[in-house]
Swiss-Prot record:
It comes from the Bacteria. HAMAP family: UPF0161_YidD (MF_00386). InterPro entries: Membr_insert_effic_factor_YidD. SMART domains: Haemolytic. One of its GO terms (cellular component) is plasma membrane. Belongs to the UPF0161 family. This is Putative membrane protein insertion efficiency factor. It is a peripheral membrane protein. The keyword Ion transport does not apply.
Length: 92
């Protein structure tokens, strides 16, 4: 089911990038742009994980963030759940 949603979602992002984004002007603080990042994340990790990564990216795309080069990660486990935040079952 997720693959059935993936292609139309990427198509919607392409339409946004081509038709709506030029009207709004360049506002993204990152390279690649947030829409390109979303397309790459969805294509690489599937619909749900891709949307999660894209939402996290959009939350970072704001004036208090310096921006810069921020590609889609190669490995989602290190991006979404870093070792310092994983539950090991040992509590102090």
């Amino acid at each position: 089911m997720h693959k059935a949603i993936m292609h139309p979602l990427i198509l919607l992002l392409k339409i946004y990038k081509r038709l709506i984004s030029p009207l709004l002007g360049p506002h993204c603080r990152f390279e690649p742009s947030c829409s390109e990042y979303a397309m790459g994340a969805i294509a690489r990790f599937g619909t749900l994980r891709g949307i999660w990564l894209a939402a996290r990216r959009l939350a970072r795309c704001q004036p208090l963030q310096p921006g810069g080069y921020d590609p889609v990660p190669d490995n989602i486990s290190t991006q979404v759940n870093p070792p310092s935040h994983r539950c090991t079952g040992h509590h102090q």
